[in-house]
Design a protein with these regions (language model features):
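Charge-rich, low-complexity N-terminal segments
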Residues: 1-120, 124
């Protein structure tokens, strides 16, 4: 049977600061630029969660997208929306909050709760 992918899009807003605590303020500013601002900055994130698998012949689903949306909201959006990622999101603490690391942490939060293969986390900060 053929494998297919389905994608669910969610959105959240959050503040953060890019910095490596082992570096000086000058080095953080040199590497991360204005994103190292001590007063934080924010983004309107768009999150795409891609799952794949074979279609269940009885339901026509790889996964019910409403169920996937509920999992994403419970595990990610409710915890990250209108929060400071560095200070208020337990699974982001002690992590440099780049888009890449946010995607990795979101993957780790979702992988055990999704009843299909989690194949891609895409996050954008337009």
């Amino acid at each position: 049977m053929k494998s297919v992918r389905v994608i669910r899009r969610e959105r959240f807003n959050a503040a953060h600061r890019l910095f490596n605590p082992e570096w000086s303020d000058d080095k953080n500013e040199e590497v991360f630029g204005k994103c190292a601002n001590k007063n934080w900055h924010g983004h309107n994130y768009t999150l795409f969660v891609t799952v794949e698998g074979t279609v269940d012949p009885e339901t026509g689903y790889v996964i019910d997208l409403k169920v996937l949306s509920d999992v994403i909201k419970k595990r990610i959006v409710d915890k990250m929306d209108h929060k400071n990622l560095n200070l208020e999101v337990d699974f982001m603490k002690d992590t440099i909050t780049t888009a890449e690391n946010i995607a990795i942490k979101i993957y780790e939060q979702l992988e055990s709760d999704i009843q299909a293969t989690l194949s891609l986390i895409h996050i954008s900060e337009p």
